[in-house]
């Protein structure tokens, strides 16, 4: 029997699990500190999405409106438990974030991609905006456009 994956909005009760997942999955310099995660849950509940099975957090995606362009979301984190990588969870979370962007009428989702993830984000519908410096190495500024927003314009 297969256990279904649920995509839900993050809540304050998820904070300890989110912190534990990022501690196991990210280098220390890329981890968000507790009060920033808590503030993100409070301010960005619509765009802080979790992938869960029955009783375990498997991954999350965090995006919020860009301060200088509030019609666009900026994706800050996409974190998947190491035991569940390469099973489509990241793609599932990105699809859920795109769905939220459409529902909330965001024009686009932007992200910064390191070289090694460029093809992954391209596979998920993001295009390279421009080559940029990212985390002291070459990286890419990528964007996904809301197709429904483009149709209306």
Task: Label every model-predicted segment.
Residues 4-18:
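A short beta-loop-alpha structural element at the N-terminal edge
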Residues 101-113:
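Conserved GNAT acetyl-CoA-binding A-motif
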Residues 65-76, 85, 135-138:
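A conserved beta-turn-beta hairpin within the catalytic core of GNAT-like acetyltransferases
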């Amino acid at each position: 029997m297969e256990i279904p994956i649920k995509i839900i909005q993050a809540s304050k009760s998820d904070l300890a699990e989110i912190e534990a997942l990022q501690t196991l999955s990210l280098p220390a310099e890329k981890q968000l500190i507790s009060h920033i995660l808590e503030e993100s849950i409070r301010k960005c509940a619509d765009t802080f999405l979790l992938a869960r099975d029955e009783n375990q957090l498997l991954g999350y995606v965090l995006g919020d409106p860009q301060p200088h362009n509030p019609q666009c979301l900026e994706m800050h984190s996409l974190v998947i438990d190491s035991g569940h990588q390469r099973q489509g969870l990241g793609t599932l979370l990105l699809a859920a974030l795109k769905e939220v962007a459409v529902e909330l009428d965001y024009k686009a989702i932007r992200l910064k991609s390191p070289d090694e993830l460029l093809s992954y984000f391209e596979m998920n519908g993001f295009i390279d905006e421009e080559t940029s410096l990212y985390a002291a190495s070459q990286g890419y500024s990528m964007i996904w456009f809301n197709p429904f927003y483009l149709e209306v314009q």
